[in-house]
Swiss-Prot record:
GO biological process: formaldehyde catabolic process; one-carbon metabolic process
Entry keyword set: Cytoplasm, Hydrolase, One-carbon metabolism
Gene behind the chain: mch
Chief localization: cytoplasm
Pathway info: One-carbon metabolism; formaldehyde degradation; formate from formaldehyde (H(4)MPT route): step 3/5
Catalytic activity: 5,10-methenyl-5,6,7,8-tetrahydromethanopterin + H2O = N(5)-formyl-5,6,7,8-tetrahydromethanopterin + H(+)
Enzyme Commission no: 3.5.4.27
Subcellular location: Cytoplasm
Keyword Cell membrane among record annotations: no
Molecular-function GO terms, alphabetical: methenyltetrahydromethanopterin cyclohydrolase activity
GO CC annotation terms, alphabetical: cytoplasm
Name listed for the protein in its UniProt record: Methenyltetrahydromethanopterin cyclohydrolase
Length: 333
C-alpha cells in the first residue's frame, strides 16, 4: 500500500462534521437551559432556546450561542479586557477550523423574512439551506440527509412564530422537528456576546471579499471587547455597540499557508480602517444610510487590527489600529 505524502493531504487536515458537532452542542445547551437563565420552548415541533427575548439570558448563554454558531469547532471564552478596551471583559475565540466554523457556521448570511418577522440567521443550518454564493464557492453547502438536524442562531428581539419555523425548516430541507434554534436580541447579554465573538469571522469574510484564498488560513485567534448592552428595545443601539466593538476594538491573528505576494496584496486592506465609512460610531453610519445594511460599505465590516503570520516565509504583517474614542462614545462612557 502506498503511503500518503504531505502533498496528498489537505492543508488543514480532515474536517469534522459541522452539523453533527452543532447538534451535540445544542443538546448540551438545551439540557442546561435553566442554569443559563434561558427558556427551552417548542414551536411548531422545532426546539427553540430563548436566550434573551422573554428571559434575561446570561453570560454563559452568550458563550453557548457563540459555540452554536461555530458548530462548536472553536474555543470561545471570556478574558479580562485590556485598558484599551474600556470594559471589563473581552470575548476571545481560537479555532483550527476557521473556514468551516466561521464562514460555514458563524457568518450571518441568512436574512430570515417571513410576513412581519425578521431575523439575521447564522449557524451550520445555512449549509443545508445553501442559497449563499460564498457557501457555493467554498463548497460548503449540501442537501440535508435524514440524519441531519438544522441548527442555528437568530438575532432578533422576538421569537419566531409557527409560520417562520415551517418556512425555515422547508428551506433547510428538514422536518420542523429537526430544526434547533437559539434566539437572542443584540440588546441582551447573550446576544451581545455572540455577536462580539465574530472577530475572526469578519476577517475571513473580508479576505474572501478581497478574493484571497481563505482555505489558506490554517488557524486563527481573535478577541473583541464585550460592550455594555444597549437599553432593551433599542435595537439600533445594540447593533451599533456590538459592531463598534468589532470595527474599533477587535484584534485578529491569522496563521496562513500562502506565498508572501498573495498576503502582501491584501494585508493592509483587511482592517476596518480601509473603508471610507470608518471613524464614526456605527449607529451614526447606519442612520446616514437610512438603516439599510446593504448601503453601508461592505469593506467596513472587519476587525480593527489584523496580524498575519506566514507559515511559508516566517514573515508577519500587522495593520489597523484600536479607536478608543469611538468606542467610548458608542459605549456611553
Amino acid at each position: 500500500m502506498k503511503s500518503a505524502t504531505p502533498d496528498d493531504l489537505p492543508r488543514t487536515g480532515v474536517e469534522p462534521d459541522l452539523s453533527r458537532s452543532a447538534s451535540e452542542c445544542f443538546e448540551s445547551l438545551w439540557n442546561g437551559a435553566i442554569g443559563m437563565r434561558s427558556l427551552p420552548l417548542t414551536i411548531a415541533g422545532a426546539r427553540v432556546l430563548d436566550a434573551g427575548v422573554t428571559c434575561s439570558g446570561s453570560l454563559e448563554a452568550g458563550l453557548g450561542l457563540a459555540r452554536l454558531c461555530l458548530g462548536d469547532l472553536a474555543n470561545v471564552r471570556y478574558v479580562p479586557a485590556t485598558a484599551d478596551d474600556l470594559v471589563g471583559l473581552s470575548v476571545t475565540i481560537q479555532t483550527d477550523h476557521p473556514v468551516l466554523s466561521c464562514l460555514g457556521g458563524q457568518y450571518a448570511g441568512w436574512p430570515v423574512s417571513v410576513a412581519d418577522y425578521f431575523a439575521m440567521a447564522s449557524g451550520p443550518m445555512r449549509c443545508l439551506r445553501g442559497k449563499e454564493a460564498m457557501l457555493e464557492q467554498l463548497h460548503l453547502s449540501r442537501q440535508a440527509t435524514d440524519d441531519d438536524f438544522a441548527v442555528g442562531v437568530l438575532e432578533s428581539d422576538t421569537l419566531p412564530g409557527e409560520d417562520v419555523i415551517e418556512a425555515m425548516a422547508d428551506e433547510c430541507g428538514v422536518d420542523p422537528s429537526r430544526l434547533c434554534l437559539a434566539v437572542a436580541p443584540s440588546t441582551s447579554i447573550a446576544g451581545s456576546a455572540q455577536v462580539v465573538s465574530r472577530s475572526v469571522e469578519t476577517a475571513l469574510h473580508k479576505l474572501h471579499a478581497l478574493e484571497f484564498d481563505v482555505t489558506r488560513v490554517v488557524s486563527a485567534h481573535g478577541d473583541a471587547p464585550l460592550p455594555p448592552p444597549a437599553k432593551k428595545g433599542d435595537t439600533i443601539g445594540g447593533i451599533g455597540r456590538t459592531n463598534d466593538a468589532m470595527l474599533y476594538g477587535a484584534r485578529v491573528t491569522l496563521w496562513v499557508d500562502a506565498e508572501d505576494d498573495a498576503i502582501d496584496s491584501v494585508a493592509s486592506k483587511v482592517p476596518s480602517q480601509s473603508s471610507d465609512d470608518h471613524g464614526r460610531p456605527f449607529a451614526e453610519i447606519f442612520k446616514q444610510y437610512e438603516y439599510d445594511f446593504y448601503q453601508v460599505d461592505p469593506m467596513l465590516f472587519s476587525p480593527a487590527v489584523v496580524t498575519i503570520h506566514s507559515l511559508q516565509s516566517g514573515r508577519t504583517w500587522r495593520h489597523g489600529q484600536i479607536s478608543i474614542d469611538v468606542m467610548r462614545k458608542s459605549f456611553g462612557l
